[in-house]
């Protein structure tokens, strides 16, 4: 229907169009100076020394794991309540994903669950900053330091998120997403931040065929036209067309996230009169980026299942999302790990629903969602 309200929509405007035109007019549309500008700007946001732009957060996760030397027989700890790309990258490298449970009310991976899963084969810990809220980094990094295990933060939801006064990423290595539904977007893209120069160099090489330089380096730096392969790599570089859009979006980040926060506050107020349960907020000091606004639909409490609620909202022209179906319940992973049970993850996976939340959402859009929820709840 023409008036369908999606659960997410990118906030694009004249600034993004102008940024694209500038790149097209420049004659250099693939990886180049706009990537360098984006990386520098993102370092200013997070406080890191290095940033490496990539074609997606999935690509960033892949090469970050490779740069750590993750391979056959290694174990990587991550929550099952995450997008499956992280698990896929672990498996494709020959390593074993060790999926752990999350807090029932915040859906955050807990240090207790992580520590219980650590073995001599554990080579990385990947906490997820879920829905725009931060995981408990002090406790998680303390575990990493105690056991000598690197931490890679999955910050796909966390552009604009802070933990105890510091932007996500400032503690070490984090991977952000610029996918179309994220807080800032360039259609597809991502960025890895780190303070380790050797790690950053490995990422730059792995993202571009294993070469020590990219096409812009050779064009602008007067280097030899044929660089050497240092180790086999991939084609994960971000075109300047995308980087320019991401830069324009980054300049709007505070305003975009402020609007998200305002809508989330309205949702919280409205939910007081409805049976649907929003996620609880973490107890530690933080700034929430409000990538998603998630409710839990428990049939015993709400009189309707989550799937029925989503179907009913769809008939009313309102879109919703599911973030996420637990990874260990997906066909490949449930067959590979048939005895794995994660009670709090599974309880939530069957009940969570993402409501519409995006910066261009109007008051009328919001009222429409709340009216529909009241109708479904029989109020």
Curated annotation (Swiss-Prot):
Q: Does Aminoacyl-tRNA synthetase count among this protein's keywords?
A: no
Modified positions (N6-(pyridoxal phosphate)lysine) are 182
Q: Name one GO molecular function term.
A: UDP-4-amino-4-deoxy-L-arabinose aminotransferase
Question: Which pathway does it take part in?
Answer: Nucleotide-sugar biosynthesis; UDP-4-deoxy-4-formamido-beta-L-arabinose biosynthesis; UDP-4-deoxy-4-formamido-beta-L-arabinose from UDP-alpha-D-glucuronate: step 2/3; Bacterial outer membrane biogenesis; lipopolysaccharide biosynthesis
**EC category:** transferase
* Record keywords, A-Z: Aminotransferase, Antibiotic resistance, Lipid A biosynthesis, Lipid biosynthesis, Lipid metabolism, Lipopolysaccharide biosynthesis, Pyridoxal phosphate, Transferase
Name the needed cofactors.
pyridoxal 5'-phosphate
EC number of this enzyme: 2.6.1.87
Q: Which residues form the signal peptide?
A: none
Q: Name one GO cellular component term.
A: membrane
Catalyses: UDP-4-amino-4-deoxy-beta-L-arabinose + 2-oxoglutarate = UDP-beta-L-threo-pentopyranos-4-ulose + L-glutamate
Keyword Protein biosynthesis belongs to the record:
no
One GO biological process term is: lipopolysaccharide biosynthetic process
> What interactions and quaternary structure are annotated?
Homodimer.
What the record says about family reads: Belongs to the DegT/DnrJ/EryC1 family. ArnB subfamily.
Q: Quote the function comment for this protein.
A: Catalyzes the conversion of UDP-4-keto-arabinose (UDP-Ara4O) to UDP-4-amino-4-deoxy-L-arabinose (UDP-L-Ara4N). The modified arabinose is attached to lipid A and is required for resistance to polymyxin and cationic antimicrobial peptides.
This chain's protein is named UDP-4-amino-4-deoxy-L-arabinose--oxoglutarate aminotransferase
The protein's organism comes out as Salmonella newport (strain SL254)
Upper lineage is: Bacteria, Pseudomonadati, Pseudomonadota, Gammaproteobacteria, Enterobacterales
């Amino acid at each position: 229907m023409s008036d369908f309200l999606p659960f997410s929509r990118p906030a694009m405007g004249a600034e993004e169009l102008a940024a694209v035109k500038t790149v097209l007019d420049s004659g250099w549309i693939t990886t180049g100076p706009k990537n360098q500008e984006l990386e520098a700007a993102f370092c200013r946001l997070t406080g890191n020394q290095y940033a490496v732009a990539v074609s997606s957060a999935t690509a960033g996760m892949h090469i970050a794991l490779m740069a750590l030397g993750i391979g056959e027989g290694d174990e990587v700890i991550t929550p099952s309540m995450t997008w499956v790309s992280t698990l896929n990258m672990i498996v494709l490298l020959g390593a074993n994903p060790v999926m752990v449970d999350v807090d029932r009310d915040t859906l955050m991976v807990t240090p207790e669950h992580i520590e219980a899963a650590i073995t001599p084969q554990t080579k990385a810990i990947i906490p997820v900053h879920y829905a725009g809220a931060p995981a408990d980094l002090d406790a998680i990094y303390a575990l990493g330091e105690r056991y000598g295990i690197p931490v890679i933060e999955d910050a796909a939801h966390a552009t604009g998120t802070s933990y105890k006064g510091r932007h996500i990423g400032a503690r070490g290595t984090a991977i952000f997403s610029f996918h179309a539904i994220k807080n800032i977007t360039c259609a597809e893209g991502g960025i890895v931040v780190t303070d380790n120069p050797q790690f950053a160099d490995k990422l730059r090489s792995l993202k571009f065929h294993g070469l020590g330089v990219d096409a812009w380096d050779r064009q602008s730096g007067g280097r030899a036209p044929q660089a050497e392969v240092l180790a086999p790599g991939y084609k994960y570089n971000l075109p300047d067309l995308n980087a320019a859009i991401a830069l324009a979006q980054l300049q709007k980040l505070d305003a975009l996230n402020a609007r998200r926060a305002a809508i989330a506050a309205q949702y919280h107020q409205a939910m007081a009169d409805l049976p649907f349960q929003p996620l609880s907020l973490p107890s530690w000091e933080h700034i929430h980026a409000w990538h998603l606004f998630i409710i839990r639909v428990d049939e015993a409490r709400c009189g309707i299942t989550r799937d029925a609620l989503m179907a009913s909202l769809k008939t009313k022209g309102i879109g919703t999302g599911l973030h996420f179906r637990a990874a260990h319940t997906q066909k490949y992973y449930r067959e590979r790990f048939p005895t794995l049970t994660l009670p709090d993850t599974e309880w939530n996976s069957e009940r969570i629903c993402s409501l519409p939340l995006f910066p261009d959402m109007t008051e009328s859009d919001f009222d429409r969602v709340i009216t529909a929820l009241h109708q479904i709840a029989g109020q």
